From Swiss-Prot:
GO terms for cellular component: endoplasmic reticulum. This is Uncharacterized protein C1604.03c. It comes from the Eukaryota.
Length: 330
C-alpha cells in the first residue's frame, strides 16, 4: 500500500539522489579529472545545476552521457576516491612526504569538527614544510584532490591552510640562479616583478643564509598577486569544481526552487572580496557587477545557504556583514 500511495520520483530527482551521497562521505575525495585527464562529470553537472538554464530532458540526457566517465572505486558502496597513500603516490612527485601526511590526517578528517584541523595542519606544516611541496605539486593537483569532496567546513579549513603556501611552491626543481636578493618580498609579489618559481628559489636560498624568516613568516605579507596568479592558472580546472561540490547542500535544500536563484559559499565570498575588481576568469553569467554585494553575505553556520537574489538582473544592496576570514596562521 505504501508503494501505491507514494509520490513517483521524477527522473531528475532519481539522478540527484545518486549524486548527493558522493559528496557526503568525509573520508573520500572527488577528483576534477581522472588519470587520463577526462573531466569528472559530477562537479560540472552540479555547476550546471547552479548556473545553467536547462530543461529537464537536457539534464537527464547530460547525466546519462556523463556518468560513465566517473572512475569507479568503492567506498561504502559509492563511486568515490579515498584518501589513499598509493593513489597519492601515483599523482605526486614527492611520495615520501605524502605517506606520513595521509596516515596522520586520514583518521582525523572523518571526525569533522572534533579536532581543530586548522591548528593540526598548521603545526604539522610548520614542523615539516616539505609537505607543502608534495601537496602543491603539479599545479596543486593533490591539494585540489584532497579538498574537493570533503565536507564543506573541512574544505574551507584545508583551503585556508594551504592556499597561501601554494604560492611558494613549484614542481620544477631546476631553477636558474637569481643574481641579487631583493629585500622586500611583498613588493616583488605585488608588482609581479619575478615569477613564482624565481620567488621560491630566492626564499630557499635565503633560508640557507638565515637572511630572512621562513616561508611561513613571509606568507603573512600581502600575497594577493601571487594567489591571483595561482588561481588564474588553475581556476577553471579545479576551483570551479570545488565550488560545484561545495554547493551540494544548497542543491539538496533548495532543489524544488528555481535554479535562477544564486547561491554562493563562504569561501567564494572570501575569494571574490579579495580582489578590487571582478576577475575576468570568473565569468559565470550571474556574476556581474553585483559581485561585491554577493560577497557581503551573512552566515549562521557552516552549511548556511547564502541566497543573494532571486533574479540575475536584480541589483540589490548588500544583505549582511562582510564575511571575516579566519586570520592567517602565525
Amino acid at each position: 500500500m505504501g508503494a501505491i500511495l507514494s509520490t513517483p520520483k521524477t527522473p531528475i530527482e532519481v539522478r540527484r539522489k545518486r549524486i548527493v551521497p558522493l559528496f557526503r562521505a568525509n573520508h573520500t575525495r572527488f577528483r576534477p579529472v581522472d588519470e587520463k585527464n577526462r573531466i569528472n562529470a559530477v562537479p560540472l553537472l552540479l555547476l550546471g545545476c547552479l548556473y545553467g538554464k536547462y530543461k529537464d530532458d537536457d539534464f537527464v540526457d547530460f547525466f546519462d552521457k556523463a556518468i560513465p566517465l566517473l572512475v569507479p572505486q568503492t567506498h561504502k558502496g559509492l563511486d568515490t576516491y579515498e584518501i589513499d597513500v598509493s593513489t597519492y603516490k601515483t599523482h605526486i612527485g614527492h611520495p615520501k612526504f605524502i605517506e606520513p601526511f595521509v596516515l596522520f590526517y586520514g583518521d582525523r578528517l572523518v571526525h569533522d569538527a572534533r579536532y581543530n584541523l586548522h591548528e593540526l595542519v598548521w603545526q604539522t606544516l610548520s614542523r615539516n614544510p616539505e609537505y607543502i611541496k608534495g601537496l602543491c605539486y603539479d599545479s596543486c593537483t593533490p591539494l585540489a584532490n584532497l579538498a574537493v569532496g570533503l565536507s564543506l567546513n573541512i574544505q574551507e579549513v584545508l583551503i585556508d591552510c594551504f592556499a597561501t603556501a601554494a604560492c611558494f611552491t613549484t614542481e620544477d626543481t631546476s631553477i636558474n640562479p637569481i643574481p641579487t636578493l631583493p629585500s622586500v618580498f611583498c613588493t616583488i609579489v605585488d608588482d609581479e616583478g619575478i615569477s613564482l618559481k624565481e620567488l621560491l628559489y630566492i626564499i630557499e636560498e635565503s633560508l640557507l643564509k638565515n637572511a630572512i624568516p621562513d616561508p611561513f613568516s613571509v606568507s603573512t605579507y600581502t600575497l594577493k598577486s601571487a594567489f591571483e596568479h595561482l588561481v588564474k592558472k588553475d581556476f577553471l580546472k579545479y576551483y570551479t569544481a570545488y565550488l560545484a561540490s561545495s554547493a551540494v547542500d544548497y542543491i539538496d535544500a533548495y532543489f524544488t526552487e528555481s535554479f535562477g536563484s544564486f547561491f554562493i559559499s563562504r569561501l567564494a565570498s572570501q575569494f571574490l572580496v579579495s580582489f578590487q575588481t571582478l576577475p575576468s576568469f570568473f565569468s559565470f553569467p550571474l556574476v556581474t557587477d553585483n559581485w561585491q554585494h554577493l560577497a557581503a553575505l551573512p552566515f549562521n553556520s557552516t552549511y548556511e545557504t547564502f541566497r543573494a537574489f532571486d533574479h540575475p538582473s536584480t541589483n540589490g544592496p548588500a544583505i549582511g556583514p562582510l564575511y571575516n576570514a579566519a586570520p592567517a596562521p602565525r
